[in-house]
Amino acid sequence: NNPDGPKYPAGLEEKDLNKTVTRTITYVYEDGTPVMENGAPKVVTQEAKFTREAKVNLVTGEVTYGDWSEAKDLAEVKSPVVKGFVADKATVPTTKVTADSKDATEVVTYKPLGSWVPNIPGQPTNPIKYPNDPTDPTKPGTEKPKAPYVPGFTPKDKDGNPLKPVNPNNSEEGYEVPNLPTDPSQDTPINY
């Protein structure tokens, strides 16, 4: 019988035996404003929880810790497609974390997609936004609209090359737009 009772030293609290590592993914526009989803900023929070055991020497009060539970994977998170914008990352990749890993924050940034810009003399410009790729948030889509037909004008690309009519027998059906630039956030002029 121990009349003084066992010695329970410091170091056996919940925080000494449990640890959580968090990865927070935020989605923002170039100017820093958050991408909204259902009326709130879109944020993905992933957590990995780790535990370990402790043994107490009841005579000396010394605490010895076991190893933290094994490493865990925080799953890959696909970036959403945001209409009219391109993301700088298609995914935030899977990452392995241990109890010693620091909390992390990942930011996915969206830039506005550019437009085909018909420059028609005497008319206001009416830009045609590049389409989104429905599955890859980092790329524009492949569907192409038509450049408008304007009587008396032949539309040209930025290098002065005439655009091809959609229907070679009837240019009134419009013209094939030029290919997109390497950076899909840049506009493509169509000069008349």
Identify the meaning behind each predicted range:
Residues 1-192:
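Extracellular modular ligand-binding repeats in secreted and cell-surface proteins
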